[in-house]
Structure formats: structure tokens, C-alpha cells
Amino acid sequence: MQRSVTAEESYRRGRDHLDRGEMQPALDHFRAAHQVDRANPRYRSFYGLGLALVERRFDRALELCRSAAKEEFFNPELYHNLARVHLAFGFKAEAIRYLRRGLMIDPGNGAMQEELRGLGLRRRPVLSFLPRRHPVNRLLGRFIRPWGVVEEEPAPEPQSA
């Protein structure tokens, strides 16, 4: 006799596969969890993440992840998923925005901190009224950087000519 798998078991198996980088099996388990319990924001968010990473369905993935984060706005993990969906489709600025939102809820979240660091954050110019490349900003930046006084900001997106 085969027992039915609960939504939570499917979700946990999906997380295990996701952590190992096995995206298709992760999506299958997240889909199963979502089908059993469509009201659960966590299952909905991870199902959306799986759709983005495996099937490249940005609109549906974004819809699922946003609705989950809206419902459970205090869960930083759901903002992390939103950021990962945006990153999968090249929307770096939006990803940074959602990572920061998640870190406002849980400042000690190592996964989100690491993801944010990996996106190549730059320091703000010392004198914001001067361009970043101005010699005075560059000189002051070299002296101030060792003390970590200047705040960080996202690296600008490359502009096409």
C-alpha cells in the first residue's frame, strides 16, 4: 500500500533538490506541494521559483512569487525567491531591491547577504555632487575606503551605446 505524500514532504524534497542544483526534480516536488495546498504562500513562492529556473516562465513565476510575498510579507525567504526570479531573467536592479527588502526583515540572513555581495555592489561616490570618475572623488575614495566609511550602492547596469 502506497501512502500519499504530504505537501510539506514534497516541499522539503524540492528544497533538497534545489540545494543540490537539481532544478527539474525540485520543480516537480514544488509543483506537487502547490497542487496539494495552493493557499500556502511558501509552496507558491518556491513553485514560482522553479517555473522561472526550469521552464523560463517569467510572468507566471513573478505572479506566484509576488502574491506569496504580498500574503506573507514578513517572510524574507519569499523576497529572496523574488530576487532569484528577477536575476534569472537579468533584472539585477529589481533583484537587489528585493534582497534589500528581505534583509530589512532578517538582517542576519547569510544567503541573501551572499547573493547581494555576489551582485557586485559599489561604494557611493564620496562627494555625491561630483561624478564618480572625477579625480577628487577617486582620490578621496582611495583614502576613505580602508575605513569602510562610504555606503554601498548597486553597480550601475551597463548602458548600451
What is each PLM-predicted segment?
Residues 19-29, 54-67, 89-101, 125-131:
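Structural signature of tandem alpha-helical TPR/SEL1-like repeats
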Residues 47, 82, 140-143:
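Non-transmembrane alpha-helical oligomerization segments
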Residues 12-19, 31-77, 84:
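Alpha-helical adaptor scaffolds
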Residues 62, 79-80, 95-99, 109, ...:
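Short amphipathic alpha-helical surface patches that serve as generic macromolecular interface elements
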Residues 1-12, 16-19, 70, 74, ...:
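Intrinsically disordered, low-complexity, charge-biased linker/tail regions
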